[in-house]
A protein has these predicted regions:
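Active-site nucleophile and cofactor-binding loops and adjacent substrate-binding regions
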Residues: 6-13, 74-75, 324-325, 343-357, ...
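Acidic, Ser/Thr-rich peripheral helices and adjacent loops at domain boundaries
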Residues: 414-433
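A short, conserved beta-to-alpha structural element at the edge of catalytic cores
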Residues: 38, 350, 395-419
Length: 493
């Protein structure tokens, strides 16, 4: 499969990569990180001193817990072997990050590629699964109220086409994790909504009525199933398909059938399944989808749900949408209506503020002919504000929608719930501030629009049609809170 590559210098260059490495691990992104290091002769090794070479740091030891493989190369003749080994680990099985630490003298060495040792990978094998596939087929045939949870593992397995064919054939209703949201277009009759605390009430309620849960490439996280997983879908048998045996063995939900396989292979074994969901259950699922109610209506400033509605209408058919974290990601995934070939992704599991700005740059550079939309908050954009200069100087045509609610709403919600509304560093009255974004755009030579009320929504189209980069600030009321669906039992933080 494809692999991303990031290169950093020694010391702080390596440590600055750590948040990205963690995100790549938790979202299963195959990535090779190459980090510089002081010369081998300057490494402190087993010496008891703090540091020997300037900016020396044991980056391998730091990232071991959040990589699939990390090593330091001190012999230049091992470069090919270690590179091939790292790429293999990054791309095989459950994808993830790997890191290679290269001392300066190894970087400078002259090598003969033809004489270097090669890495010969062993083929990955999974437990014999014929019986598991047969049992899966039997459980599906016996079910009356089946429900699929679509996770990120569908796309990781390259199984979007097979997944859609399976859903079209069986007509089983589908609910989604954030990472699986773009595996089925919003207008598909089996598309119900997002499962969990930050999803849709109808999707949650339907899961409680299901008699069979088929989880495809998803994890049963607390945000999805609540603090008491036994009460999630308590009437249902559960089939979980995951390439990672650890998720099957030690996941939070008790499984009736654990299938270690990638989703594409699993669906291939079910291609001869003759099954179609009954009309009564499909009608129930359709009613569940219709239960999603946005906070509609004109407000003093902008209702973010209405904004995302309008943005959905204006986006091109092959747009890539990258929301950041906090309120803007919740309102985006809850309200966006994805079309057939649109993509949405973020750092779903690690969720660092500021992610969507540099991620949008990478998405645009990798897909120059596609419309790339960054949705970010006034707090998040300040984490990576310097990237506006990179965007400007390289004319990277990202369309940035900055949802400005004058604070950290997710933190405010926690302070409301746990601290009696005693805000600290989370709003304009208690230590938080942000710059004048119009002046900031002028300084970076980036065009600027302002959507101050819903009457300004025509500027969404103007923003999307602008050649090159542009930032559109959207004024959100300070006290606006995203809609959280009826929670699963025991979902207290």
């Amino acid at each position: 499969g494809k692999i991303g590559v990031a290169i950093g210098t020694s010391g702080p260059g390596g440590t600055n990569l750590i948040t990205g490495i963690a995100g790549a691990l938790y979202d299963c992104i195959p990535t090779l990180y190459i980090v510089g290091q002081v010369r081998s002769t300057e490494l402190k090794g087993k010496l008891t001193i703090l540091q020997r070479g300037f900016q020396e740091i044991d980056i391998v030891k730091l990232v071991k817990p959040i990589t699939k493989y990390a090593t330091q190369i001190t012999n230049c003749n091992n470069i090919r072997y270690e590179m091939e080994k790292a790429v293999h680990y990054a791309t095989q099985g459950r994808p993830g990050p790997v890191l290679i630490d290269l001392p300066m003298d190894v970087q400078e060495a002259n090598i003969d590629l033809s004489n270097l040792k090669r890495f010969h990978a062993k083929s990955i094998s999974f437990p014999e699964s014929a019986d598991l596939f047969n049992r899966s087929i039997s459980m599906i045939r016996r079910s009356i109220h089946p429900l699929i949870i679509a996770g990120g593992g569908i796309r990781h397995a390259g199984a979007v086409k097979e997944f859609r064919e399976f859903v079209d054939k069986t007509k089983i209703p589908v609910v989604f994790s954030f990472a699986g949201l773009d595996t089925l277009p919003h207008n598909h009759p089996s598309h119900i909504g997002i499962l969990g605390q930050y999803g849709h009430a109808g999707a949650n309620q339907l899961s409680q009525k299901a008699d069979l849960i088929i989880s495809l490439g998803s994890r049963f996280t607390k945000k999805m199933v609540g603090s008491n997983p036994d009460r999630f879908a308590s009437k249902a048998k559960v089939i979980s398909v995951n390439i990672d045996s650890g998720e099957l063995k030690d996941g939070q939900k008790q499984l009736d059938l654990a299938v270690q396989a990638d989703v594409k292979y699993f669906l291939a074994q079910l291609k001869d399944l003759q099954y179609e969901t009954g009309e009564e259950w499909n009608l129930e699922a359709t009613k569940a989808k219709m239960k999603w109610k946005k906070l509609k209506g004109v407000r003093r400033l902008v209702n973010p749900y209405e904004f995302i509605d309008h943005l959905s209408e204006c986006m091109s058919d092959k747009s890539i949408i990258i929301p950041d974290v906090g309120q803007n990601v919740v309102t985006t995934v809850q309200s966006i209506r994805l079309k057939e070939n649109q993509r949405i992704f973020s750092s779903w599991a690690n969720s660092p503020m500021g992610y969507s700005l540099p991620a949008s740059m990478g998405a645009k550079l990798g897909n120059p002919d596609k419309e790339v939309i960054c949705i970010i908050g006034d707090g998040g954009i300040q984490v990576n504000l310097q990237e506006l200069q990179t965007i400007s100087s390289n004319s990277i045509g990202v369309k940035i929608f900055l949802l400005n609610n004058n604070g950290y709403v997710t933190i405010q919600e926690f302070q409301d719930k746990k601290l009696g509304g005693r805000y600290v560093a989370s709003d304009l009255k208690h230590g938080y501030s942000h710059p004048n974004f119009k002046k900031l755009c002028s300084a970076f030579n980036i065009p600027y629009h302002l959507i101050n009320t819903q009457k300004d929504f025509y500027k969404i189209n103007e923003t999307l049609k602008t050649n090159g980069p542009i930032l559109c600030e959207v004024s959100i009321e300070d006290n606006f809170r995203p809609i959280l669906p009826d929670p699963m039992p025991d979902t207290e933080a």
